[in-house]
Amino acid sequence: SVMVLMHDLTVDRTTNGKGKVEDYTFEEIQRLNLVDRAGNVTPYKIPTLKSILEWGKDKVVFNFDNKYINTKGVSPEVKKASLDYYIRQLRPGGDWSMYHNIMLSVRSLDEALYYWNNNVRDVMFCVEISSEEHFEAYDKCPIPWDHIMAYVRMAVNPELSDVYRKLHDRGVMIMTSITGSSDKVKNAKDRRVAYERELLAE
């Protein structure tokens, strides 16, 4: 099988095709074209993951977010299989192991440790640290801070300034997510104000 880059489980929203990605062969999916935001068909094809990793080598940080982990209706067996697939690709000798610009978004310390304890070491882990309890848990775990990017949820929270200070003291960068929030504000000026409010915690 060939891994392709597709955000959704279906091709409906982003291509001129219909149906689930998994129902297409690679040859069939290469016949589709991507569409722009207005729905206009472009000359561009769905790229393979390998081609994008090569394109971004040494110049882009890729955030790999294993959606099977928190997708409703996915069995524990499939979730474990998806984790194990990532592990095979990221361990030395795996197809992704030569790319040193991959960050893994994980949903829990247990998930991060599953990767770490299975010898996935040459990646950054994007983990939620939005409480003192989160910080303490990661501070006590074997994953070194120089392998961690801290996700602090939807906005900077002044009440967590001590946690942010501790993270910065350990050289940890932090990031917020604005997906599903201010990015949906229609007016550009209002959207900028909303972004600044979230990012600066005014």
Where are these regions (language model features)?
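Short, solvent-exposed loop/turn segments at secondary-structure junctions
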Residues: 10-11, 69-71, 111, 132, ...
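Second-shell loop/turn segments in exported
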Residues: 38-42, 69-77, 101
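Glycine-rich phosphate-binding "P-loop"
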Residues: 60-82, 94, 183-184
